[in-house]
A protein has these predicted regions:
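Low-complexity, Lys/Gly-biased intrinsically disordered segments
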Residues: 75-83
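Helix-start/capping segments and mature chain N-termini
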Residues: 1-59, 82-254
Length: 254
């Protein structure tokens, strides 16, 4: 097998949302994908322009008969063989599309996943195919009747949920794990931060966050490209409000 995405996890991916005839935040996703490929020393094909990228996404949606909302996944992998040292840095890609299932209407409860940790540092901000901690955290959440699990790094700092970035609200303070924690450099995370920084009277902090903060804050919400903004209802015995999440969701049209 010559696909290095299978043999070494030598691949990255992105997830995009198609809705109302458009791919949400397409430009931002494209720029992040190009940046991630450069970071992983993958050569970018000359035809991989923004226009060409959008055309491939739309072609995949059409081939799958998806005209309403859909989840798109773009997988990019290094081509050729080799072992840890690749024979080539050329890259190829695959595009998958599927219908977005209806959201569950049950209370959204989270719990810490402490069996394994995410590595801090900038490499973890890239969506590589090495997602084993996220997978095990998702299994843990399902087996224990939680809607999601919160991951930590080797410094025992909060990183994010298994599939999303994490925001905590305490009065006028907006707190989210910094990129150095190992959280994904999320597109919706960035949009939310941009919006909240324009709000008067609020202090926005990208910083190291202790798990103990989850029991001290007023509100918790998660962000990703498919969910948009997901309010968290409960963590252990702590119930949360959702006023900031509702405000940002309205302002960003999510």
């Amino acid at each position: 097998m010559q696909n290095r995405g299978f043999t070494y996890g030598d691949a990255l991916f992105d997830v995009l949302k198609f809705e109302a005839g458009n791919v949400t935040f397409l430009d931002d996703h494209y720029i992040r994908l190009m940046s991630s490929m450069r970071m992983l020393r993958m050569k970018i094909p000359s035809h991989f322009t923004l226009e060409g990228y959008e055309k491939e996404l739309m072609k995949t949606l059409e081939a799958n008969g998806l005209k309403d909302s859909a989840r798109l996944r773009v997988s990019v992998f290094r081509t050729g063989g080799g072992h840890y040292l690749p024979e080539s840095n050329q890259s190829e890609y695959l595009v998958d599309a599927e219908k977005i299932p209806d959201a569950a209407d049950s209370p959204y409860e989270i719990e810490l996943f402490k069996d394994y940790h995410v590595s801090s540092g900038l490499l973890s901000t890239v969506k590589t195919n090495n997602r084993m901690v996220n997978i095990l955290g998702s299994i843990f959440a399902q087996e224990n009747d939680f809607q999601n699990a919160i991951l930590i790094n080797e410094r025992k700092e909060l990183v994010g949920a298994t599939d999303s970035n994490l925001f905590l609200i305490k009065q006028n303070r907006i707190i989210t794990p910094s990129l150095d924690s190992g959280c994904i450099n999320g597109i919706v995370r960035r949009k939310v931060l941009e919006h909240l920084r324009k709000s008067e009277g609020r202090v926005v902090e990208e910083t190291a966050v202790s798990p103990f903060e989850l029991l001290k804050v007023d509100e918790v919400f998660l962000t990703n490209s498919i969910l948009g903004i997901q309010s968290v209802d409960r963590y252990r015995k702590k119930n949360f409000t959702d006023s900031v999440a509702r405000e940002v969701r309205l302002e960003l049209g999510m």
